[in-house]
């Protein structure tokens, strides 16, 4: 799976900016400027912010993905 030349791994580390923790999400798919992932059964949709940075929000928390 590739987006604009970036290889997308099956498991992706994302950083929660609210509690300063890093967690792994499972890649599901991508479409346009969004990447769908799964965090322990919870769907997270990361939107492209800039360059290789994607951001998702869930339950009041922000998650950042760098590819």
Model-derived features: positions:
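Cysteine-centric segments in proteins
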Residues: 1-67
